[in-house]
Amino acid sequence: MKEVIQDKLGRPIRDLRISVTDRCNFRCDYCMPKEIFGDDYTFLPKNELLTFEELTRISKIYAQLGVKKIRITGGEPLLRRNLYKLVEQLNLIDGIEDIGLTTNGLLLKKHGKNLYQAGLRRINVSLDAIEDNVFQEINNRNIKASTILEQIDYAVSIGFEVKVNVVIQKGVNDNQIIPMIDYFKNKNIEVRFIEFMDVGNDNGWNFNKVVTKEEMLNMIEQHFEISPVAPKYYGEVAKYFRHKDSDAQFGLITSVSESFCSTCTRARLSSDGKFYGCLFASSEGFDVKALIRNGATDDDLKAQFKRLWSIRNDQYSDKRTMQTIENNRKKKINMNYIGG
């Protein structure tokens, strides 16, 4: 039986984001800078990750509490061995209406068919530039944008619905906005531009690196005729715009200039098995893995999940100032543990 639960600000729980690994094959500066995540960096050992059975058990209980959507993240989730088996298990959960995956796309040709056969239908690909030299500078692994574009084409060809996410940094890749809109408009693939956020401790964020929604729109409107699109559902994070000469759309995710904390319905499970109520969480998180491995029953887990959501009052982006950023520095969980 489903229950309706709300947090302290009246927000229901609708989404569960699961990080299945803290590892990644890219070293993007805004997430896993190579100076910190070098060859000698120690990632989580296999036994510290939640098993697929544990993740499925958790997801079943969250579905009873109102979760309808699950997104699989990382790190890079396609590095998790046999990920399609998790998708198969999640697809059997009553009440889960949508399962998505966020990936850098590099391994889609290798794993895409198995994932599609397991029931995955929606993929978000993180691609921060369309020009090879710009993209190589960002990912620090000499991976060309053209390589990822080929992977996207493959994913579309076997039936996936693909969206593209682009984190925009001033002076780094803001010159990619127009060519990316132009390219994906012709492919009829939604591209979403994300304001650079202060996630984690190590990405060197400050306000001066942010290209705001208004700045992006000013750029875009010099090249395209567009009109706004009404939100599709409560809690939608992207603000969408449609081209007047086609049905193609693009989105802007404005977590800095126009935050959306008031409608956030996401619970997050980190790669080391901890619950977080916010992408910018500065706490240690609640150790779900320890609870499970110490013999908790489903009723025990359900009671804890209800409690954690009922006391949730996170609204970091609504209150973001340089002072709050400084106060939380070195306390926030890094993106490779909690996903984007």
Swiss-Prot record:
Binding sites annotated in the UniProt record for S-adenosyl-L-methionine: Y30, G75, S126, M197
GO biological process, one term: Mo-molybdopterin cofactor biosynthetic process
Cofactor requirements of the protein: [4Fe-4S] cluster
PROSITE patterns hit by this protein: MOAA_NIFB_PQQE, RADICAL_SAM
Domain Radical SAM core: 8-229
Cystine connections: none
Source species: Staphylococcus epidermidis (strain ATCC 35984 / DSM 28319 / BCRC 17069 / CCUG 31568 / BM 3577 / RP62A)
GO molecular function, one term: GTP binding
SUPFAM superfamilies xref list: Radical SAM enzymes
Keywords: 4Fe-4S, GTP-binding, Iron, Iron-sulfur, Lyase, Metal-binding, Molybdenum cofactor biosynthesis, Nucleotide-binding, S-adenosyl-L-methionine
Pathway: Cofactor biosynthesis; molybdopterin biosynthesis
Catalyzed reactions: GTP + AH2 + S-adenosyl-L-methionine = (8S)-3',8-cyclo-7,8-dihydroguanosine 5'-triphosphate + 5'-deoxyadenosine + L-methionine + A + H(+)
Cofactor binding, per record: Binds 2 [4Fe-4S] clusters. Binds 1 [4Fe-4S] cluster coordinated with 3 cysteines and an exchangeable S-adenosyl-L-methionine and 1 [4Fe-4S] cluster coordinated with 3 cysteines and the GTP-derived substrate.
EC number: 4.1.99.22
Residues where [4Fe-4S] cluster 2 binds: C261, C264, C278
Subunit structure: Monomer and homodimer.
Binding site for GTP: R17, R71, T102, K163, R266, A267, R268
Pfam families, per the entry: Fer4_12, Mob_synth_C, Radical_SAM
Nucleotide-binding among keywords: yes
UniProt xrefs under CDD domains: Radical_SAM, Twitch_MoaA
UniProt protein name: GTP 3',8-cyclase
Sites where the protein binds [4Fe-4S] cluster 1: C24, C28, C31
